[in-house]
Protein backbone atom coordinates (compact mmCIF):
# COMPACT_ATOMS: atom_id res chain seq x y z
CA UNK A 1 0.00 0.00 0.00
CA UNK A 2 2.87 2.37 0.75
CA UNK A 3 4.25 1.79 -2.76
CA UNK A 4 0.83 2.68 -4.17
CA UNK A 5 0.85 5.87 -2.10
CA UNK A 6 4.26 6.80 -3.51
CA UNK A 7 2.91 6.42 -7.05
CA UNK A 8 -0.18 8.38 -6.06
CA UNK A 9 2.01 11.17 -4.69
CA UNK A 10 3.83 11.30 -8.03
CA UNK A 11 0.49 11.48 -9.83
CA UNK A 12 -0.69 14.20 -7.44
CA UNK A 13 2.43 16.30 -8.05
CA UNK A 14 2.40 15.78 -11.82
CA UNK A 15 -1.30 16.66 -11.93
CA UNK A 16 -0.53 20.01 -10.31
CA UNK A 17 2.48 20.54 -12.58
CA UNK A 18 0.40 19.88 -15.70
CA UNK A 19 -2.37 22.21 -14.52
CA UNK A 20 0.04 25.05 -13.73
CA UNK A 21 1.94 24.57 -16.99
CA UNK A 22 -1.27 25.52 -18.83
CA UNK A 23 -3.24 27.70 -16.41
CA UNK A 24 -3.03 29.47 -13.09
CA UNK A 25 -5.51 29.95 -10.27
CA UNK A 26 -6.69 33.09 -12.04
CA UNK A 27 -9.99 32.30 -13.81
CA UNK A 28 -8.89 34.46 -16.76
CA UNK A 29 -6.09 32.00 -17.49
CA UNK A 30 -8.62 29.16 -17.47
CA UNK A 31 -10.84 31.03 -19.92
CA UNK A 32 -7.83 31.72 -22.15
CA UNK A 33 -6.84 28.05 -22.09
CA UNK A 34 -10.28 26.73 -23.04
CA UNK A 35 -11.54 29.52 -25.32
CA UNK A 36 -8.23 30.44 -26.89
CA UNK A 37 -6.46 33.78 -26.99
CA UNK A 38 -5.79 35.60 -30.27
CA UNK A 39 -3.11 37.74 -28.60
CA UNK A 40 -0.98 34.64 -27.90
CA UNK A 41 -2.19 32.69 -30.96
CA UNK A 42 -3.74 30.06 -28.68
CA UNK A 43 -6.53 28.07 -30.33
CA UNK A 44 -9.70 27.11 -28.44
CA UNK A 45 -9.79 23.57 -27.08
CA UNK A 46 -11.61 21.33 -29.53
CA UNK A 47 -14.46 19.04 -28.60
CA UNK A 48 -12.37 16.07 -29.72
CA UNK A 49 -9.45 17.21 -27.55
CA UNK A 50 -11.71 17.56 -24.51
CA UNK A 51 -13.33 14.20 -25.25
CA UNK A 52 -9.95 12.44 -25.42
CA UNK A 53 -8.94 13.91 -22.05
CA UNK A 54 -12.32 12.98 -20.56
CA UNK A 55 -12.01 9.42 -21.88
CA UNK A 56 -8.72 8.77 -20.08
CA UNK A 57 -9.38 10.91 -17.01
CA UNK A 58 -12.78 9.37 -16.27
CA UNK A 59 -11.25 5.91 -16.09
CA UNK A 60 -7.95 6.78 -14.41
CA UNK A 61 -9.36 9.19 -11.84
CA UNK A 62 -12.27 6.87 -11.12
CA UNK A 63 -9.93 3.96 -10.36
CA UNK A 64 -7.58 6.18 -8.35
CA UNK A 65 -10.38 7.61 -6.21
CA UNK A 66 -12.03 4.22 -5.81
CA UNK A 67 -8.76 2.77 -4.53
CA UNK A 68 -7.92 5.68 -2.22
CA UNK A 69 -11.41 5.88 -0.73
CA UNK A 70 -11.48 2.10 -0.31
CA UNK A 71 -8.22 2.28 1.65
CA UNK A 72 -9.64 5.15 3.70
CA UNK A 73 -12.50 2.89 4.82
CA UNK A 74 -9.98 0.98 6.95
CA UNK A 75 -8.65 4.12 8.64
CA UNK A 76 -10.06 4.75 12.14
CA UNK A 77 -12.39 7.66 11.37
CA UNK A 78 -16.09 8.20 11.92
CA UNK A 79 -18.48 7.04 9.22
CA UNK A 80 -19.50 10.66 8.70
CA UNK A 81 -15.93 11.72 7.89
CA UNK A 82 -15.49 8.73 5.60
CA UNK A 83 -18.71 9.54 3.75
CA UNK A 84 -17.68 13.19 3.34
CA UNK A 85 -14.24 12.14 2.11
CA UNK A 86 -15.75 9.86 -0.51
CA UNK A 87 -18.38 12.38 -1.63
CA UNK A 88 -15.96 15.31 -1.78
CA UNK A 89 -13.28 13.45 -3.70
CA UNK A 90 -15.61 11.99 -6.33
CA UNK A 91 -17.60 15.24 -6.55
CA UNK A 92 -14.41 17.26 -7.05
CA UNK A 93 -13.19 14.85 -9.72
CA UNK A 94 -16.45 15.04 -11.66
CA UNK A 95 -16.70 18.82 -11.25
CA UNK A 96 -13.10 19.27 -12.38
CA UNK A 97 -13.81 17.42 -15.63
CA UNK A 98 -17.19 19.08 -16.21
CA UNK A 99 -15.95 22.62 -15.52
CA UNK A 100 -13.62 22.62 -18.52
CA UNK A 101 -16.52 21.64 -20.77
CA UNK A 102 -18.59 24.34 -19.11
CA UNK A 103 -16.00 27.02 -19.84
CA UNK A 104 -15.62 25.93 -23.44
CA UNK A 105 -19.24 25.33 -24.41
CA UNK A 106 -21.52 27.02 -21.84
CA UNK A 107 -20.11 30.16 -20.19
CA UNK A 108 -16.71 31.54 -19.16
CA UNK A 109 -18.01 31.82 -15.59
CA UNK A 110 -17.36 28.10 -15.22
CA UNK A 111 -13.68 29.05 -14.90
CA UNK A 112 -14.29 29.71 -11.20
CA UNK A 113 -15.67 26.17 -10.87
CA UNK A 114 -12.58 24.81 -12.65
CA UNK A 115 -10.22 26.55 -10.22
CA UNK A 116 -12.25 25.57 -7.15
CA UNK A 117 -12.75 21.95 -8.22
CA UNK A 118 -9.05 21.57 -9.09
CA UNK A 119 -8.04 22.83 -5.64
CA UNK A 120 -10.66 20.63 -3.95
CA UNK A 121 -9.57 17.56 -5.92
CA UNK A 122 -5.89 18.11 -5.11
CA UNK A 123 -6.75 18.71 -1.43
CA UNK A 124 -8.94 15.63 -1.10
CA UNK A 125 -6.39 13.38 -2.81
CA UNK A 126 -3.66 14.73 -0.51
CA UNK A 127 -5.83 14.19 2.57
CA UNK A 128 -6.70 10.64 1.52
CA UNK A 129 -3.02 9.83 0.95
CA UNK A 130 -1.98 11.31 4.30
CA UNK A 131 -4.76 9.57 6.25
CA UNK A 132 -3.92 6.17 4.78
CA UNK A 133 -0.17 6.69 5.22
CA UNK A 134 -0.63 7.79 8.83
CA UNK A 135 -2.70 4.71 9.60
CA UNK A 136 -0.10 2.43 8.00
CA UNK A 137 3.01 4.03 9.46
CA UNK A 138 1.74 4.36 13.01
CA UNK A 139 0.12 0.91 13.13
CA UNK A 140 -3.33 2.29 13.73
CA UNK A 141 -5.88 -0.53 13.99
CA UNK A 142 -8.19 -1.21 11.09
CA UNK A 143 -11.62 0.27 11.59
CA UNK A 144 -13.70 -0.78 8.63
CA UNK A 145 -16.97 -0.31 10.53
CA UNK A 146 -16.19 3.28 11.51
CA UNK A 147 -17.12 2.91 15.16
CA UNK A 148 -14.77 5.69 16.31
Summary of predicted features, one role per range:
Residues 1-25:
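N-terminal signal-anchor transmembrane alpha helix
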Residues 24-44:
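Membrane-interface interhelical connector segments
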Residues 84-101:
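Hydrophobic alpha-helical membrane segments
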Residues 98-148:
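Alpha-helical transmembrane segments of multi-pass integral membrane proteins
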Amino acid sequence: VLCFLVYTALLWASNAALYFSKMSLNPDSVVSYYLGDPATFRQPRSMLGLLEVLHFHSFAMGILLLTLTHLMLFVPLSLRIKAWGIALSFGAGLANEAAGWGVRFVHPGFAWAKVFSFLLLETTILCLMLLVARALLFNRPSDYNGDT
